[in-house]
Amino acid sequence: MENGDIGDVILVRCYSQDPISIIEGTLEYAPRSGGQFIDMSIHDFDLIRWLTGSEVKELWATGGCYEFKQYKDWDDGDNVSGLMKMENDAMAFFFAGRAAAHGSHVETEIVGTRGTLRIASVPTDSLVEVMSQHGVCRECYQDFITRWHDAYITEIEEFCDCVATGRKATPGVIDGTQSTKIAFRCKESFLTDKKLTLE
């Protein structure tokens, strides 16, 4: 992207799905959580701002309680999605779900004027593919701790390096604040079914 190989960003698409195997813990935590937009999609909002190099101009969020109706009691959904129009006219789509049968699935796609990048379109936990009379099988990550293990270590190392060297961390406080604003506006859009500006 930095070399311009895919051209200007047209669309960023983010998927974040928790595995069904952890749904009991997710449901136990849900009443005191921030909900899908604040606890889960906020990471995609960080990515969208970074990958488009722009701020959100308008957004609309929707979703529902497709499998776990109790999310309605918490003004939330078990599956939510949304569309965003960025200030530079790029578009963004995000989806967050709580019950992926195949495991933890986090995927990003960036569509540009001259090409497309897909990151983790199949959430495999190894480079091994099993080919048999049943077809091709690739094992998927079954939990987010395993999926994000290396990222967590890198994050801690980066933080420690910033403290040790006095270097300012990026992304910074403003980035976190912006993503939080987006999350709250998405929640409001979800509850009111209205397209909103970021304000």
Question: Where does each model-flagged region fall?
Answer:
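Predominantly a Rossmann-like dinucleotide-binding segment in NAD(P)-dependent oxidoreductases
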Residues: 1-74, 193
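C-terminal helix-rich "cap/oligomerization" subdomain common to oxidoreductases
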Residues: 87, 161-199
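C-terminal "lid/loop" region of Rossmann-like NAD(P)-dependent oxidoreductases
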Residues: 138-147
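Short coil/turn segments
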Residues: 15-17, 122-124, 147-151
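A structural signal for well-ordered alpha-helical segments within the folded catalytic domains
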Residues: 35, 42-46, 150-157, 174-181
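Contiguous beta-strand/loop segments that form the cofactor/metal-binding neighborhood of enzyme cores
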Residues: 45-125, 153-167
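A cross-taxa feature marking solvent-exposed loop/turn segments within ectodomains of secreted
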Residues: 7, 101-103, 191
